[in-house]
Amino acid sequence: MSWQAYVDDHLLCDIDGQCLTAAAIVGHDGSVWAQSDAFPQCKPEEIAAIMKDFDEPGSLAPTGLYLGGTKYMVIQGEPGAVIRGKKGSGGVTIKKTNLALIIGIYNEPMTPGQCNMVVERLGDYLFDQGF
């Protein structure tokens, strides 16, 4: 299965009639493996800051999490494994695997819990596969 198929079929899937706004699979070095059309163009320093927060949990809290220039307030995640952000009625979930970051962006009416489930389910699967 191609990386794009993982984004299209597993991240942009329908959950109770809702769907992520945008999604991507990005390497730890910031290289995009696959992304949806609506996924923002991320800057290398944004991915570097996210990677730093996985190594040093809490480092993003004072400044916020940025994706494509959009700022998200960092909320409770799982240190070293999941970072979650909130902006207005939407937000982002980022799951770290051995080689990649699985990123899902949502807006209402999708809920944070639905976004977490979609992103973390694929992240756990890829982690178990060695990715």
From Swiss-Prot:
InterPro entries registered for this protein in UniProt: PFN, PFN_euk, PFN_sf, Profilin_CS
Pfam hit, one: Profilin
Keywords: Actin-binding, Allergen, Cytoplasm, Cytoskeleton
One GO term describing the cellular component: cell cortex
SUPFAM superfamilies associated with the record: Profilin (actin-binding protein)
Main location: cytoplasm
Gene Ontology molecular functions: actin monomer binding
Cellular localisation: Cytoplasm, Cytoskeleton
Subunit note: Occurs in many kinds of cells as a complex with monomeric actin in a 1:1 ratio.
Family label: Belongs to the profilin family.
Protein role: Binds to actin and affects the structure of the cytoskeleton. At high concentrations, profilin prevents the polymerization of actin, whereas it enhances it at low concentrations. By binding to PIP2, it inhibits the formation of IP3 and DG.
The name this protein goes by in its record: Profilin
